[in-house]
From Swiss-Prot:
InterPro entries: Carotenoid_Oase
Gene name per UniProt: Rpe65
Disruption phenotype: Mice exhibit changes in retinal physiology and biochemistry. Outer segment disks of rod photoreceptors are disorganized, rod function is abolished although cone function remains. Mice lack rhodopsin, but not opsin apoprotein. Furthermore, all-trans-retinyl esters over-accumulate in the retinal pigment epithelium, whereas 11-cis-retinyl esters are absent.
Higher taxonomy: Eukaryota, Metazoa, Chordata, Craniata, Vertebrata
Name recorded for this polypeptide: Retinoid isomerohydrolase
Organism listed in the record: Mus musculus (Mouse)
Protein modification: Palmitoylation by LRAT regulates ligand binding specificity; the palmitoylated form (membrane form) specifically binds all-trans-retinyl-palmitate, while the soluble unpalmitoylated form binds all-trans-retinol (vitamin A).
Family: Belongs to the carotenoid oxygenase family.
Gene Ontology CC: one annotated term: membrane
Sites of N-acetylserine modification: 2
Amino acid sequence: MSIQIEHPAGGYKKLFETVEELSSPLTAHVTGRIPLWLTGSLLRCGPGLFEVGSEPFYHLFDGQALLHKFDFKEGHVTYHRRFIRTDAYVRAMTEKRIVITEFGTCAFPDPCKNIFSRFFSYFKGVEVTDNALVNIYPVGEDYYACTETNFITKINPETLETIKQVDLCNYISVNGATAHPHIESDGTVYNIGNCFGKNFTVAYNIIKIPPLKADKEDPINKSEVVVQFPCSDRFKPSYVHSFGLTPNYIVFVETPVKINLFKFLSSWSLWGANYMDCFESNESMGVWLHVADKKRRKYFNNKYRTSPFNLFHHINTYEDNGFLIVDLCCWKGFEFVYNYLYLANLRENWEEVKRNAMKAPQPEVRRYVLPLTIDKVDTGRNLVTLPHTTATATLRSDETIWLEPEVLFSGPRQAFEFPQINYQKFGGKPYTYAYGLGLNHFVPDKLCKMNVKTKEIWMWQEPDSYPSEPIFVSQPDALEEDDGVVLSVVVSPGAGQKPAYLLVLNAKDLSEIARAEVETNIPVTFHGLFKRS
């Protein structure tokens, strides 16, 4: 990328501070010119409450969900936010303590209860969080905020009011679902979640929610499982955050970061644990890649294998002359990256933040190429015949296909993460450009654009400025893939600056078009979408 900016003032700590919700939208001060065609709402979510009374949350993914909205109309911008009224939030506010265990924070029984009632409360089963702080996605005409459990929360995208909690277990066989479903052009939703398969072993189900039909029945009522992927360990599913989808195929990457279900069901219920306590790494399995035929709903028993890495975000997946191209934001090795995302680490002074990041898995953007047709006579050969990639796939004598990637980007402690593309037109298809959030030792301090064919990089960066995931919005009359703008929420705690602003960049070269400043701090946000008016 470019010269690394240092952060000795520690302004990034503002990303992890509690804020209050707003009673009404704020008018933003716009400099530059917002394109008049940009009409709609940028919706984002993330943690906004980092403690309840005297009880702190400990992990980045623990804070209570705050829903944000920037409205664009005729070149003007307003900003609004409200806490999502999940069970976790409402009960915490009512009891003035953390009531439901979060990703890295344990909830303990009410200290006012006697020892017998506290003991028996542990045997009521695991109480799963509905803290919907990770992403927002549409189902039919509705919008849902989500985490990665079986609960999703229906919200009103206009008022930011919470409508209701939905338990996916009531409709489909999954223990949870990722926060990164795929949405097809007709509104069909695909997602993945682990489940209990045959003989009580763990598997992964691909679920499909159809588009809204003329009968106006809630599409979630018509959810179905379309294919099932086997698990490499019958009692320890891998952590899954996203997956790949093309018009004809589904790609699932099974990493060595595992959920120990015995620990989840026993330790948690009996003496208290949190989600992070239940993760472990399989140091010998490497990574398994699975493929299924989407239309025929058939699992391919091709044994794709490669060396270990963590994976959270797929960039894009597409078909190319009998091969699948799978572009990923990887973290090298089998150790869980989330071990380094405790708030105490992220709030350290800059030199300590860098020291901690030096110990963590290192990021790399990779392209894997998966051959769909396998012939045993090719044992020992590289099966990749595409001229435009250095990625390889070698058939071994044990019938596994060993994959080596083409590296699209690699920088020491510099990650290209939270990737976005022109998804509406190029999701699941050959593409050229990806946009990402640049992490400098886990601190988000730049926005990036990558040409995945030439590996050229463009970048936006300013001192004491901490952007969010870039959201690409195509202009209505777009002729080229990158005709449009990139939107990002920037926290700017430096002297002489407003606390935060919405940044509008030209998607061609990441030059600034406009910014809309607000007189309030905005904590870290993870994911979101642009909803056109």
